[in-house]
Design a protein with these regions (language model features):
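Short, well-structured N-terminal submotif of metal-dependent ribonuclease cores
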Residues: 1-36, 45-59
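Active-site neighborhoods of divalent-metal-dependent phosphate/nucleic-acid chemistry enzymes
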Residues: 2-5, 66-114
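Conserved glycosyltransferase catalytic-site signature
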Residues: 11, 38, 93-95
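A generic structural signal for short hydrophobic patches within well-formed alpha-helices
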Residues: 14, 41-44, 74, 116
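Short loop/helix-cap segments at secondary-structure boundaries that form the rim of catalytic
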Residues: 25-29, 114-121
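Residues at the C-termini of beta-strands that transition into short coil/loop
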Residues: 38-40, 70, 112, 128
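Short beta-strand->loop
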Residues: 121-129
């Protein structure tokens, strides 16, 4: 029996689901139990346009595990920024998200190929919806 794949879902996929982009909701449901990072929560709340949207995001995320920052995630994110920020345009929060997936042994689900595709050690899946 093989272990189920553990997924860390990136901000773009969650935004697609919140906006009811065709296929995004079923894709998330197909993952089973998935998690999101504190960096993803920060991006979502930063992009909220009202308190109503903040409450909707909180409610939507409440059933899922949030992976919090750790010292190891911070150190790995720093290494990722130093190595990939210029050639691939990987930003600070994307580096934290990638580091979270690597440290937790998870597969990152994201449509953002440019920022994540070359990061060494990152298991990466591009949703097809």
């Amino acid at each position: 029996m093989t272990a189920a794949t553990l997924y860390l879902v990136d901000t773009d996929v969650l935004i697609d689901a919140f906006r009811k982009i065709e296929g995004a909701g079923p894709y998330l449901n197909s993952l089973g139990e998935w998690s999101y990072s504190t960096a993803t929560a920060m991006e979502l709340f930063f992009g909220a346009r009202s308190k109503k949207e903040i409450h909707a995001i909180e409610k939507s995320l409440s059933s899922y595990r949030r992976v919090r920052f750790s010292h190891e995630i911070g150190e790995l994110a720093l290494d990722i920024v130093k190595k990939y920020a210029k050639p691939d345009g990987t930003g600070e929060l994307d580096a934290v998200i990638a580091a979270t997936a690597i440290e937790e042994g998870m597969t990152l689900a994201s449509r953002n190929k440019k920022h994540f595709r070359n990061i060494e050690g990152l298991k990466f899946e591009v949703p097809e919806y």
